[in-house]
């Protein structure tokens, strides 16, 4: 796989606060190789390592996208949810940004059933069918539809398991990560200083609490995905 240049520079990462880890008391010793210093009670992430692994991740998603592979982006913490939705829509990726429902991937048949109910309800609403129901029943179905939209809206067009899963905040999304490991789905994870770097196929050390840091990482990955899909469209 030929390496490409993704314009990942130190100044931009510093400005986005990518280097700021967790407190020195809240860390995983396995992250030691990815930490360059301690400052005012927090660990400072080695941005040279961040750039290296982010570049590797961009290469991977570029070539996967150029072959038409499908991606799922997962990030449900308060700093990530909005950025995940925007980035995913930009690159036409599936996403989960509110809550990971246990078994979403490992019990795919159940997820498919939920998605079909969601599609059916949404179609019924568009046709105006819910307006013809008794008020109590219509209200109940509208609430159900709103809940399905909240938790499944980002995967409503997913017809099978994703080829690659991108995880923002590995610590919070541990259940999603474990499901990917069980199914053998490759993962790219944004890992802060309290994470285990050995759990993902590509682990990108970075601040997972700052919106600017999350946006920086996602923007690079999404740009690479878009470039990959574009190169696929240009093939004769």
Swiss-Prot record:
An example Gene Ontology molecular-function term: structural constituent of ribosome
Subcellular location: Plastid
Recorded family membership: Belongs to the universal ribosomal protein uS2 family.
Statement: the UniProt record of this protein carries the keyword Hydrolase: no
BP GO annotations: translation
Protein name as annotated: Small ribosomal subunit protein uS2c
One protein family per Pfam: Ribosomal_S2
GO cellular component: mitochondrial small ribosomal subunit; plastid
Transmembrane segments: none
Keywords linked to the UniProt accession: Plastid, Ribonucleoprotein, Ribosomal protein
Family matches, as PANTHER family: 30S RIBOSOMAL PROTEIN S2 PROKARYOTIC AND ORGANELLAR, SMALL RIBOSOMAL SUBUNIT PROTEIN US2M
InterPro entries for the chain: Ribosomal_uS2, Ribosomal_uS2_bac/mit/plastid, Ribosomal_uS2_CS, Ribosomal_uS2_flav_dom_sf
